[in-house]
Every structure is written in C-alpha cells, then in structure tokens.
Curated annotation (Swiss-Prot):
Protein name (database record): NADH-quinone oxidoreductase subunit K
UniProt keyword Membrane present: yes
Enzyme Commission code: 7.1.1.-
Organism (species): Sulfurovum sp. (strain NBC37-1)
Main location per the UniProt record: membrane
Length: 100
C-alpha cells in the first residue's frame, strides 16, 4: 500500500529537482519552469497530507496555489517576452551586463 511517506518522498524529490533547476540554470525561462516544478511538488505534499488526515484544507491550499501559479504564468511569460524582444536573450549574465 502506498502511504503518506511515499507521497512525501516523491514530493521532496520533485522539489529537490526544481530547487536544483533554480540554483543551476542561468536562463530566466528555465528558472520559471523550475519554480513551477517546485510549486507542483508542494501541491503533491498538500494533497497527500490532506488525504491522510481526512481534511480538505490541504486540497484547498493546493487549488489556491494552482490559481496563483496560473496568474504567475500569465504575468511571468509576458515579462519574459518583453525582455526577449528588448535584449534578444533571457540569460541572466547577459541581462545583468545590459543595464539601461
């Protein structure tokens, strides 16, 4: 039987993958994707804990995080498109050197 610990381990592994993506990548789009992976890992943990304790609070938090992530995608991709059109790159090192 798959217990709570299995879900939490999978959630921690997925969160670790997202964290490594945030720490290792220099491209803003990849940082954006890694952040979304981390948010989805938190959603898995909330849903698993909610199911384990027979409480819907964790699932409500997960739906709230999904709504926040959707608005983040809309705003974030708009900003990334503007940055790419203006500078021609989404690399953090290039953007740091192009002040103005």
């Amino acid at each position: 039987m798959i217990g709570l610990s299995h879900y939490l381990i999978v959630s921690a592994l997925i969160f670790s993958i997202g964290l490594m993506g945030v720490l290792r990548r220099r491209n803003l789009l990849m940082l954006f994707f890694a952040t979304e992976v981390m948010l989805n890992a938190v959603n898995i943990a909330f849903a698993a804990i909610s199911h384990y304790y027979n409480d819907l609070t964790g699932q409500m938090f997960a739906f709230f995080i999904i709504a926040i992530a959707a608005s983040e995608v809309a705003v974030g991709l708009g900003i990334l498109i503007v940055l790419y059109k203006r500078y021609g790159s989404l690399d953090l090192d290039d953007l740091a050197s192009m002040k103005g």
